[in-house]
A protein has these predicted regions:
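Structural preference for well-ordered, secondary-structure-rich domains
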Residues: 1-161
Length: 161
């Protein structure tokens, strides 16, 4: 997540991961994808649908919102920074998509829950956490806190897509 731990091995691993993730992004795009590069992107999020479903939508929003760096996020409907109202609406949609495994936006007769191939993986870069601790806290509560598992699942998913 761009934070210096002082551990040279961790720094080398982070650089190798950054190169791998960038290679996967470019490869995906070469086959018709449309994932934009984010200099601040570190790791994907793994969302455990059952853990997310177990809490009320507003409770999930109240938990995740203080962990996000809104300066790194853009309201896709306006292209502008989020307002208090628009971030609530966006996170409500994120909750719906996670808790329904994408079925909230599914349109009959389409594939990938209404998303074109090009846009299929753009959602995975929407949440921008303030730092590694905020990411880890979210993953511990609603995903998988093991960064290695997250990396391997990201590689697997990107390779299959």
């Amino acid at each position: 997540m761009g934070e210096n731990t002082g551990n040279q091995n961790a720094k080398q691993l982070a650089e190798a991961w950054k190169q791998t993730a960038e290679h996967l992004r470019k490869r995906y795009n070469s086959f018709g994808g449309k994932i934009l590069s984010r200099k601040d992107w570190g790791l994907a999020q793994i969302h455990d649908t059952l853990l997310v479903r177990a809490v009320a939508k507003q409770d999930w929003i109240d938990y995740v919102l203080p962990k996000l760096d809104l300066d790194k996020m853009t309201d896709e409907s306006t292209g502008l920074p989020f307002t208090d109202k628009s971030i609530q609406k966006a996170l409500s949609q994120v909750y719906d998509n996670i808790s329904t495994e994408g079925m909230a936006t599914f349109k009959p007769g389409t594939n990938s829950y209404g998303k074109t191939f090009a846009n299929r993986r753009t959602d995975h870069r929407f949440l921008a956490f303030k730092n590694a601790d905020a990411w880890m806290e979210y993953q511990t509560r609603f995903g998988n806190p093991d960064p290695f598992v997250t990396m391997m699942e990201h590689i697997n998913g990107m390779s299959r897509d």
